[in-house]
């Protein structure tokens, strides 16, 4: 059965697809298409171009390289990131018709870093998905932030936070919700 992205979004929006399955089903229309992203970490200055899915399987070495650029830079701790975050970003780019650099504000956060940030801001969740490697704060270079947020919401693939004053969007692979 072929699904277009639009068909998938309709199904996801109507609740016929369980939210936790949505990221893995999101690419059923084009399962054999390679997926590549270009990243820059705004805190470390590192850049990375990665083809993390070769059209058949996720490429473990490339996912490890992405985990490294998404590390907790404050403590230099690397944690395995949820690969479906990258699928979400790839879908967002596809929806928007862009191939923009993914500028990372925050990927993995150690519990110690999360606690330190939480002590300074009430906007940091106590049980943040960042501590599980299931969240990323980012923007797409040169792309209107509201468009990125709207595309992420349309996916219905997890949480979406919009932070226009700080110039980033948060996405995670938890339950579908937005703020």
Q: Which residues fall in each region the model found?
A:
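Catalytic cores and adjacent binding grooves of peptidoglycan-active enzymes
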Residues: 2, 35-40, 120-179
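C-terminal segment of N-terminal export signals and the immediately downstream linker at the start
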Residues: 20-51
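Active-site acidic/histidine clusters and adjacent loop/turn architecture
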Residues: 55-105
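Cysteine-centered nucleophilic/redox motifs
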Residues: 88-93, 110-113, 138
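N-terminal secretory signal peptides and thylakoid transit peptides that target proteins
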Residues: 1-19
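Short, solvent-exposed loop/turn and secondary-structure capping segments
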Residues: 50-51, 116-118, 150
